[in-house]
């Protein structure tokens, strides 16, 4: 749209893509476990730098609007947190055939870990480990007497600097490219697998519900098994300004 100077045809294209009804339905479908993966192009036209934060904000909005999940007691949200966490981690890994290397914390996989302070979960990570090594973390003023002196700024650490990144990373390729060994990279090559057989039944975290989803573009209405999906605009969205003063 910027290239064409907000031409009327481009504006109409944007309006056809960003529809309140389908965005609201997407929110409900995520909470029901019908959509198993979230991405940078979800929730409208996408927010690539805010995927994690927006995903857990969506979970909070659904909790406020729809109440606890059947597996959650009134004072806990573990089932919902695990459902939305799977949309960001193991389910995308399964979908792309790379769950043998990443997606969950298991023996034999890369120790790619994000550590959070509970008060800032979903908004500001405390540490990011890449293959078990510190790659990104909050650091204070190097001129200070203690390491907690503010301002704390997220920045690269040992695994995120110099020649270290290729040594703690992998490049995902198809089997032929992996066997051919012709890619000029220091990164370990790993072939993707199982992508042709992935289905909704392969998804984890309660994200395997099936149903008939229909989109009526004329009426701008979305139904699941005949039931219209609705979600009112949120009056409050968490993980926003309060966490980024």
What are these regions (language model features)?
Residues 1-85, 96, 120:
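Active-site neighborhoods of metal-dependent hydrolases
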Residues 35-37, 112-113, 126-127, 133-134, ...:
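Beta-sheet entry/capping signal
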Residues 55, 108, 132, 220:
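Conserved, mostly hydrophobic/aromatic
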Residues 82-85, 93-127:
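Acidic, glycine-enriched loop/beta-strand segments at the rims
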Residues 88:
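Residues forming the flavin
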Residues 120-123, 141-223, 227-245:
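Non-catalytic terminal accessory/regulatory regions of metabolic enzymes
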Residues 125-145:
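Terminal amphipathic helices with adjacent charged low-complexity linkers/tails
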